[in-house]
Amino acid sequence: MERYIIKDGKKLRYGYTTGSCATAASKAAAQMLLQPGEVHEVDIDTPKGWSLKLKVEDIQRSHGAVSCAIIKDAGDDPDVTNKLAIYSKLIWRQDTKIEIHGGEGVGTVTRPGLQIPVGKPAINPIPLQMIEREVREVIGPGRGVDIVISVPKGQEVAKKTFNPKLGIQGGISILGTSGIVEPMSEEAMKDSLALELPMAKAEKIKTFVFVPGNYGRDMAREKYKIHDKNMIKISNFVGFMMDQSVIQNVERILIIGHIGKLVKVAGGIFHTHSKVADGRREILAAHLAALGASQQLVLRVLESNTTEEAVGLIQEKGFDRLFSHLADKITEKCVERTQGNIEIGTIIFSMEQGVLAHCSQAGRLLEILKSEGVKDE
């Protein structure tokens, strides 16, 4: 596929989804059910509006059935499913139905909260629609087929995806709302993160612990003994996950994170990646000045190389009260973002000093977590 996008000054190639692969393989197999020859290329339309012409691989015929594969091409996206063979086998039915099944390497949904019912193969609604539309167009209204989608290496690759955490067992998911993989797409990561909220709510989780990454997760586990099922790694998408929490009617959120990440939220920055905004030293300095710190300390913090260095300078001058002030400010900003619909607390830490501060609500949320029985004793 030769379409490109420019990101951060780099020319990156688009790819196509597992859903497009499954659709193309199914269409090619349907064409070969109706004719004796082999189909070596197949065209499909994607929801994005782009047409794809894909090479058909590993054609196998048996009485009343055809199987073939399409090789997944993720373009320049770092996708663990890249180069996987996505197979579709079509078998004539006696009626006019089209039934789509999951075979080897396609996961099975085991927990509620996803778009797919428990017990069904992890083939998302858009790919299901794409497959049925393309196959029906080929075979017409008067015939029916069973379609089995399989991914021979899917079970192994699935261990590197979100699937185990989402309760999808035994393989990968057949995905793709647009049919196209946009390289280095934040939207794909956001979609995965957003899935975790309804799934946890389906398991009666009421108090969530948001951590930006592994450091926050480790602190939550080791210091506060918080169970993994309550934790969601939100990466840099603080604002997005707050918005999703409102949509999902989340009751309570405790945020646990490194000061270098969360101090940005105190300044109203809800996407915390450095390419979007930084301002860490400036925010620290502004709040120090507001609390009456000396000009010398403010200037030294502005000139510091890292947040860890700034924390050391602040503690050296006995200005530790800044940290509880910041924790309260982070909470205040998140409450404003969620329009007061969610009870929120914040805990901030540094790598060298450990926990720096709890906001005024954090202790209450820790007690609620304990009373809900989600902390390991």
Curated annotation (Swiss-Prot):
Its EC number is 2.1.1.195. Pathway: Cofactor biosynthesis; adenosylcobalamin biosynthesis; cob(II)yrinate a,c-diamide from sirohydrochlorin (anaerobic route): step 6/10. It catalyses: Co-precorrin-5B + S-adenosyl-L-methionine = Co-precorrin-6A + S-adenosyl-L-homocysteine. Keywords: Cobalamin biosynthesis, Methyltransferase, S-adenosyl-L-methionine, Transferase. One of its GO terms (biological process) is methylation. Signal peptide: none annotated. GO terms for molecular function: cobalt-precorrin-5B C1-methyltransferase activity. It is an enzyme of class 2 (transferase). It comes from the Bacteria. Belongs to the CbiD family. NCBIfam families: cbiD. PANTHER family: COBALT-PRECORRIN-5B C(1)-METHYLTRANSFERASE. This is Cobalt-precorrin-5B C(1)-methyltransferase. It comes from Alkaliphilus metalliredigens (strain QYMF).
